[in-house]
């Protein structure tokens, strides 16, 4: 990488393949959008898809992993049980937590995942296959259930500053439902230390037609994954 940034258009996701460590998976493919080959040291970011009936065998990572469900429904198995997640749901898996993904539905299950620090190719992507007991019947995510405190859900209504009164919210008002609004930009935190994340964060950003984030930098890496709409960005004086 000749610059300190990388931009990849959505059609490149067609290059998705099955990672070497997931050779025993069925119906699984992943597009590594950001990783070690790009010069990243803090970040691994990719989009995943699990076909109907597909299964990703139980494994753990030596990095922290957060996810955001883009489409379909799937089941996440951990030692704490099985959790059914769908579009808009998100969560965080701490370092060394055994987990398994499966799709028991009839449509593709798609999610984006953030990994920190960057998985290393020379160490098998810092991922290890491990046994995991059958998790039983999957329960639906309830953000008020302390058993699922490392997970959450976000919808378009959560990003609307005019729909934040208690009678319009499905959950109790708290900092978990708070919005940060400035210069035409709306920000809602998803994964942070409240979910026990220590190595990364994940948040949703919405720009109004005249929204602007001025020139700035960070002492860390940052990845943007566009869900809808268009925006103009300038990185290292290059405009996209």
Q: Which residues does each predicted region cover?
A:
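A short, N-terminal "cap"/entry segment at the start of jelly-roll beta-barrel domains
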Residues: 1-42, 126-199
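Conserved short histidine dyad/triad with adjacent acidic residue
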Residues: 27-34, 46-61, 184-187, 203-218
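Short, low-complexity cationic-aromatic patches
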Residues: 38-39, 58-62, 118, 193-198, ...
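Ligand-binding loop in jelly-roll beta-barrel domains
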Residues: 40, 75, 86-89, 95-123, ...
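Conserved hydrophobic/aromatic beta-strand scaffold that supports enzyme active sites
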Residues: 45-49, 66, 82, 90-92, ...
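A short beta-strand-loop-beta hairpin characteristic of the jelly-roll/cupin
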Residues: 55-87, 217-240
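Structured core of small recognition/catalytic domains
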Residues: 176-178, 183-240
């Amino acid at each position: 990488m000749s610059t300190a940034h990388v931009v990849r258009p959505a059609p490149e996701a067609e290059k998705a393949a099955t990672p070497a460590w997931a050779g025993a998976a069925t119906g699984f493919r992943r597009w590594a959008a950001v990783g070690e080959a790009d010069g990243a040291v803090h970040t691994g970011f990719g989009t995943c898809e699990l076909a109907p009936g597909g299964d990703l065998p139980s494994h753990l990572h030596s990095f922290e992993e957060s996810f955001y469900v883009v489409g379909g429904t799937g089941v996440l198995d951990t030692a704490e049980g099985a959790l059914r997640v769908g579009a808009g749901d998100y969560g965080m898996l701490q370092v060394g937590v055994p987990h398994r993904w499966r799709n028991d539905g009839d449509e593709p299950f798609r999610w984006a995942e953030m990994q920190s620090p960057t998985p290393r190719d020379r160490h098998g992507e810092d991922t290890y296959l491990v046994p995991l007991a059958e998790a039983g019947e999957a329960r639906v995510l309830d953000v008020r259930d302390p058993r699922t405190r490392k997970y959450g859900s976000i919808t378009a209504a959560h990003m609307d500053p005019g729909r934040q009164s208690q009678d319009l919210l499905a959950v109790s008002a708290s900092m978990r439902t708070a919005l940060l609004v400035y210069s035409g930009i709306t920000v809602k935190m998803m994964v942070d230390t409240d979910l026990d994340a220590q190595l990364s964060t994940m948040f949703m950003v919405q720009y109004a037609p005249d929204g602007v984030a001025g020139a700035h930098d960070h002492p860390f890496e940052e990845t943007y994954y566009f869900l809808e709409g268009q925006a103009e960005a300038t990185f290292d004086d290059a405009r996209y």
